[in-house]
C-alpha cells in the first residue's frame, strides 16, 4: 500500500495537496471547464500560524473548500477573477449601440472606477460593504445623489451579467442607496399661477428680456424639454393640425459640438397640441428669426431658436438666461421674489397645471413624453392647498 504524503509537521495531505521545499502548500485541481489550476498558501489549516514576514491569507484547506463549492455550483473560476472595470467593459460591449449621452455617462463611470480602488478588485471579492463604501467615496468627491444612484444601477446590472455567466453568486450592488446616503435631491417645485404671470409680465415689458418672451411662453405652454425646444425646426411646427412634432432633441458637448439625438425615451416621440396663444408665439418666432447663413446639424436645418449668428441655442444658454432674468426681477421685487427657475421648472409647471385641472393621466403622460405613468403621477404632478380645497368642496358638495 502506497504511503500517504505528509507535510513537514507530519500531517497527512489530501489528494491534490503537496508542500514545496520552501514550506508553501499547493493544491492542484481541475476546474468546471476541465482546466488544471493551482492555488497556494503558507498555512494548511485555519489554525496554523502565519509564518513570520508573510501576509495573512486564507489557509489551503479554506481555499479548497471554496474551490469545491465553485465547481459544484459551476462557478467560472477564471471569470470571477476579472476586475470590476473588466466586468463593466464587458457589459458595455454587449450593448454598444447607445446614445451619445449614454456613452458619455459610461465613460465617466469607467474613469471613476479606474481612479477608485474598487475598479481593480476582482469581482468575487467585492461585498455589499465594499459597494456602500464606494458610494460614500463618490459622495465625498461631490457627486449628487442621483448621479451616484445612476452609476450604482449600472454596476448592479453588470453584476447580474456576472451572475448569469456563473462568475459570482450574489450582487453586491443590490441595495437601496438611501440606506447609505441621504437623498438630498431638491424637490422640483412648480411655479404658482401668480408667479407664472409675474414672470411673463416682467419679461414682456422688460427692455432687455422682452425678446425672449415667446421662448418662455412656449416652454410654459408646451412642457417641452429644453433640448427638444432647441432642436425644433420650421418643419416641426404643424400649423394646420395645431401640433408641434417631437422626434429629436439637440445637444452639444465640448468634444462633439452640436449633435442630434432621438428623444430621451421611446415615449418622447410625440405630437404636442398647441393653443392659439402658443401658435401665435411660434409665428412670431419664425417672423423674427435673424437672417444668417444656413446651418445644418446631422441633416437638419432651419432651427427656430437661434442666436444672432444663426446657430441654435442650447440648454446652457437658457439656464443662464433664467438666472439673469430672476436676478433682475428679484432686484425690483424684494418683497415677493421669484424662486430659482430653470427651463425644467417651466416643464414641471406645465405638467402640474394640467394635472391640477384633472387631465386624464394617460393623456398627460403622452403629452409629457414620460416612459412610465408613475413619473407623471408621482414625480411631476404636485398638488397644492388650493387644488386640494377645491377637490374637497367638489366631492363633498
Language-model-derived ranges and their functions:
Residues 69-75, 86-142, 158-161:
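Basic/aromatic-enriched alpha-helical hairpins
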Residues 1-44, 248:
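Short, Arg/Lys-rich segments that mark the N-terminal edge of DNA/RNA- and chromatin-recognition modules
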Residues 12, 35-39, 46-52, 83-111, ...:
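Short, aromatic/basic-rich helix-turn unit that serves as a nucleic-acid recognition element
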Residues 182, 190, 250, 349, ...:
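Catalytic-site neighborhood detector that most strongly recognizes the C-terminal catalytic loop/helix
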Residues 145, 201-212, 272, 288-303, ...:
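Short, basic (Lys/Arg/His-rich) helix/loop patches that form interaction surfaces
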Residues 199, 255-260, 357, 378, ...:
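DNA/chromatin major-groove-contacting recognition/catalytic segments
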Residues 149, 164, 168-232, 240, ...:
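Basic, Lys/Arg- and aromatic-enriched nucleic-acid-binding interface segment
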Amino acid at each position: 500500500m502506497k504511503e500517504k504524503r505528509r507535510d513537514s509537521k507530519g500531517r497527512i495531505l489530501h489528494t491534490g495537496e503537496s508542500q514545496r521545499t520552501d514550506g508553501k502548500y499547493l493544491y492542484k485541481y481541475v476546474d468546471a471547464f476541465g482546466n488544471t489550476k493551482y492555488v497556494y498558501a503558507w498555512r494548511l489549516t485555519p489554525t496554523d500560524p502565519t509564518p513570520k514576514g508573510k501576509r495573512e491569507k486564507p489557509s489551503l484547506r479554506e481555499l479548497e473548500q471554496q474551490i469545491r463549492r465553485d465547481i459544484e455550483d459551476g462557478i467560472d473560476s477564471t471569470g470571477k477573477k476579472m476586475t470590476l472595470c473588466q466586468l463593466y467593459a464587458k457589459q458595455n460591449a454587449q450593448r454598444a449601440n447607445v446614445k451619445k449621452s449614454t456613452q458619455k455617462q459610461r465613460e465617466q463611470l469607467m474613469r471613476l472606477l479606474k481612479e477608485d480602488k474598487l475598479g481593480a478588485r476582482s469581482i468575487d471579492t467585492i461585498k455589499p460593504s465594499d459597494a456602500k463604501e464606494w458610494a460614500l467615496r463618490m459622495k465625498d468627491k461631490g457627486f449628487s445623489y442621483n448621479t451616484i444612484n445612476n452609476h450604482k444601477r449600472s454596476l448592479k446590472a453588470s453584476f447580474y451579467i456576472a451572475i448569469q455567466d456563473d462568475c459570482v453568486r450574489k450582487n453586491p450592488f443590490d441595495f437601496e442607496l438611501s440606506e447609505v446616503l441621504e437623498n438630498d435631491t431638491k424637490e422640483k417645485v412648480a411655479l404658482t399661477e401668480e408667479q407664472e404671470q409675474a414672470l411673463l409680465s416682467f419679461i414682456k415689458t422688460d427692455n432687455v428680456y422682452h425678446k425672449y418672451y415667446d421662448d418662455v411662453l412656449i416652454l410654459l405652454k408646451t412642457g417641452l424639454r429644453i433640448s427638444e425646444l432647441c432642436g425644433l425646426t420650421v418643419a416641426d411646427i404643424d400649423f394646420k393640425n395645431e401640433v408641434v412634432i417631437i422626434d429629436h432633441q439637440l445637444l452639444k458637448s465640448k468634444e462633439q459640438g452640436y449633435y442630434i439625438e432621438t428623444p430621451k425615451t421611446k415615449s418622447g416621440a410625440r405630437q404636442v397640441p398647441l393653443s392659439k396663444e402658443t401658435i401665435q408665439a411660434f409665428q412670431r418666432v419664425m417672423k423674427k428669426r435673424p437672417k444668417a447663413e444656413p446651418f445644418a446639424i446631422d441633416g437638419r436645418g432651419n432651427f427656430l431658436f437661434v442666436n444672432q449668428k444663426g446657430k441654435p441655442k442650447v440648454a446652457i444658454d437658457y439656464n443662464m438666461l433664467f438666472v439673469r432674468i430672476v436676478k433682475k426681477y428679484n432686484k425690483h421685487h424684494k418683497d415677493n421674489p421669484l424662486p430659482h427657475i430653470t427651463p425644467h421648472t417651466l416643464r414641471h409647471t406645465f405638467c402640474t397645471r394640467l394635472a391640477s385641472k384633472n387631465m386624464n393621466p394617460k393623456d398627460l403622460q403622452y403629452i409629457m413624453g414620460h416612459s412610465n405613468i408613475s413619473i407623471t403621477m408621482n414625480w411631476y404632478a404636485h398638488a397644492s392647498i388650493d387644488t386640494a380645497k377645491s377637490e374637497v368642496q367638489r366631492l363633498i358638495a
